[in-house]
Amino acid sequence: MKNTAADSRANRNIMLLTYVVLAAFVGLMGYFGYFLQVKSEEVINSSYNARLDRFSDRICRGRIYSRDGQVLAETQVDAQGQELRVYPFGAVFSHVVGHSSRGKTGLESLGNFYLLTSHVNLLEQVWDQLSGQKSPGDSLVTTLDAGLQMTAYQALGDRKGAVVALEPGTGKILAMVSKPDYDPNPASLDLVWDALVDEENNEGQLLNRAMQGLYPPGSIFKIVTALEAMREHPDTYREYSFDCSGVYYLEDYSIRCYHSNAHGLQNLDLAFANSCNGAFASLGLELDLAAMHDLAEQLLFNCELPLSLPYAKSAYSMEAGAGTWEILQTSIGQGTTQVTPMHMAMLTAAIANGGTLMKPYVIEQVQNAAGEEVKRFLPVSAQNLMTAQESRQLGELMVQVVERGTGSALRDAAYSSAGKTGSAEFETGKETHAWFTGYAPAEEPQIVVTVIVEEGGSGGGCAAPIARQMFDQYLLTMSE
């Protein structure tokens, strides 16, 4: 009996151990499957994975194309067999395509895994191995439009700033320009590299201002203030009234409209169209600050953004209990609030798309060396930022900006448009940053454009004309 009891306990222990080992095995296999399907590309493509670049010993880095078939980056081989990465457009795509020498940035980093992977047929790979040749890497076909990118680049000129263009219904990034820029071709980059990374260099040529440039939003933030007013007063927000004398005085504070222009009697529609600082500062005093903070975070301030390229997180700090001056400043997009051009483009795209934000993306598909599709990236809905009704109401306000307000640069276009201008103060004694964010056509939006020009002055006078050139190129020139 004692042996039987001991044997029984031993059998139970063996069975328990078997179950533990089996569970561990199943868990390990499950994680292995998850890694292969979900995490492998992320880990392999990590900048910390030193082994990835060893792929270049047997694979010639693939090309990067615009969506209209223009070569944005390719590897050329000279007579001595030396490889050279070439960027035919020079500085035009420097920030979004990036560079692959001196580290990797932009698409050269984001798509590194694909560019160093080859999907040529097996026989060709074997032949390449036996003959000591490299297999051609896969290529990236991007969502970027070369003509639209060139328009943005030329329109911005030699001024500092950024231009972003999105397709609101899909999230495709159509153009992304940041200035000042640099030539990513290795021969040029090597000559200026030390100057670019010098701690005393304050030009920031390597900074992608479209994604990483944090700016006070100025009057384009009135989109957020207006939305909060709509939510708190859904039936009466249009009845808001303010008599603008050009300067709004309260206690020891004063808020000036641009150049102290007196707008006269304003309702919310007119105040938005005319970008009346006094009206929106006064409106901010009537709003629930806790609700306003919640709204800002619903619109992705202080939050991670659904983006694949490196970006800076926008900031909003006003909370319940804030003082009068902070309320006045924050309500008109000043104070400590900061935002990137890409974030404002995403918010505008959600307004243009019925309240739904589509995840911005820049790689359309991966092709092998024969031009055959290996992988395609499809539009993905990120989240709803607002209701369809709210997006429609904001759109109506933005149409008025063009039709009778500060967006007059777009008024006589062959298409309808909607937008918001902004002039953001950032340093005493310096000209304001010029903003514009908007979309066209107003009825069935096809393109969103956001523009920031550092020290450009008024948004209507400086940034809106750049957006006009972008809309013209996309809706008129490209459709011919």
Predicted regions, residues:
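Periplasmic/cell-envelope proteins involved in peptidoglycan metabolism and beta-lactam response
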Residues: 1-193, 205, 214, 240, ...
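Beta-lactam-recognizing serine transpeptidase/beta-lactamase-like catalytic domain environment
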Residues: 2-6, 68, 169, 173-219, ...
